[in-house]
């Protein structure tokens, strides 16, 4: 009955076991929340003047840190419960951040552009696989 309800609301349903769910959700949900929380932390640590943040932050920053406004009392236990998968996702994310940092440090505009262009494919993935 729940499946019928979700389908009637035009929700996309993907069936998988709990372990698969936890692994995938660490990448597509939990990592997004952690990134948002920590981007907010980084800016708040660096920019001590809240007015400067307000004056300079645009819509891109606002949309990126939107998830950082989520409830810590909800998310801390989720992060703890899915710790193993989240650590794996964070390790992969940190590796990618370091690689991109290296491209910036070495002025490798060609590889930087190539990397960003490849990643632009995510917009089509999020529109839905037909």
Q: What spans do the regions from the language model cover?
A:
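Interdomain hinge/lid region at the active-site interface
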Residues: 49-119
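A short hydrophobic/aromatic micro-motif that marks alpha-helical segments and, especially, helix-coil
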Residues: 35, 97-98, 122-124
């Amino acid at each position: 009955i729940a499946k019928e309800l979700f389908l009637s609301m035009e929700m996309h349903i993907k069936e998988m076991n709990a372990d698969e769910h936890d692994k995938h959700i660490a990448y597509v949900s939990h990592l997004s929340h952690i990134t948002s929380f920590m981007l907010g932390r980084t800016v708040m640590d660096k920019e001590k003047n809240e007015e400067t943040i307000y004056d300079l932050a645009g819509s891109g920053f606002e949309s990126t840190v939107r998830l950082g406004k989520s409830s810590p009392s909800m998310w801390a236990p989720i992060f703890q419960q899915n710790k193993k998968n989240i650590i794996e996702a964070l390790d992969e994310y940190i590796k990618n951040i370091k690689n991109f940092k290296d491209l910036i440090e070495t002025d490798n505009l060609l590889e930087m552009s190539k990397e960003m262009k490849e990643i632009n494919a995510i917009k089509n993935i999020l529109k839905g696989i037909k």
